[in-house]
Amino acid sequence: MSVLDQNAVDINPRISEAEVGDYIALLKPRVMSLVIFTALVGMAMAPGHFHPVLAITSLLCIAVGAGASGALNMALEGDIDAKMSRTANRPIPRGRITRPEAMTFGMTLAFFSVMTLGILVNWIAGALLAFTIFFYVVIYTMWLKRWTAQNIVIGGAAGALPPVVAWAAVTGTVDVEPLLLFAIIFFWTPPHFWALALFRSDDYARAGIPMLPNVAGPDATRLQILLYTIVLIAVAAAPWALGYFDAVYGVVSLILGAGMLVLAINVYMRRERSQSLRATRKLFAFSILYLFALFATLLAEVVFRALAPMAGGA
């Protein structure tokens, strides 16, 4: 049965008794926080002056677009979420919100976020935001996630696009710098989510999602995590190696990368189940810290550059 057929079967004409908190949960606030932060870094890196009102508008539109993607994802995956312990308490499996309501909510937010960004800022950014939402909802959620173990690899492009959208909001173009940010997030995604998939493999198997551990096995997944981590370290150092950022960022990226590598090697070496679960959980948790710290360093250097001339003039 296809995703659309499943949705048709599950449509319930009743009106739910949802509270505001249930609709907020549809937006996936934790994912939104990462989207906003990476978009902020992309915006701060962009050259030229950007009016604060337009900057706030752009970030809000990107955030709302991400929230719309989350709501549409939950609407389409209500059947999956109900089978997984990690997602069973989401509003749709609990019966707080119906799938048609979530779909309407998500589509409304998607429309207004794209149109607002396009009309008030520029249509390059608006088009990129529309493509990001489309890629996450249609390409990843409706197709890749249910049909291929490479779902995270290809689908990770959607999560990597917010800095590119933010850069385009400022400049109306796309350049090398935001593509480097895109590449960092893109290559960070597989180690992050495959670590989750390793210690949640039973959950994914129960839901019928072909995550790599359930298709290729845990050992192959551990090797892929290690290989992608090595690539990630090199990609993360690229903004410094190519001369876009100073040595401070380069050192921080290598230190953080060393931490990721040690944990990835630990995951690769630990084959006994209890030790493997601990190792994968540590890598998953550290990977979140890794990305925030890496982008925080980028942002700090951009801010320092902006303040340095004023300090010198004083």
Curated annotation (Swiss-Prot):
Q: What is its main location?
A: membrane
Q: Which reaction does it catalyse?
A: heme b + (2E,6E)-farnesyl diphosphate + H2O = Fe(II)-heme o + diphosphate
Bilayer-crossing regions: 31-51, 52-72, 119-139, 152-172, 179-199, 225-245, 247-267, 284-304
Q: What cystine linkages occur within this chain? A: none
Q: What is its EC number?
A: 2.5.1.141
One MF term from GO for this chain? Answer: protoheme IX farnesyltransferase activity
Example GO BP: heme biosynthetic process
Q: Name one GO cellular component term.
A: plasma membrane
The extra comment attached to this record reads: Carbon 2 of the heme B porphyrin ring is defined according to the Fischer nomenclature.
Q: So what does this one do? A: Converts heme B (protoheme IX) to heme O by substitution of the vinyl group on carbon 2 of heme B porphyrin ring with a hydroxyethyl farnesyl side group.
The name on file for this protein is: Protoheme IX farnesyltransferase
* Species whose genome carries this gene: Bradyrhizobium diazoefficiens (strain JCM 10833 / BCRC 13528 / IAM 13628 / NBRC 14792 / USDA 110)
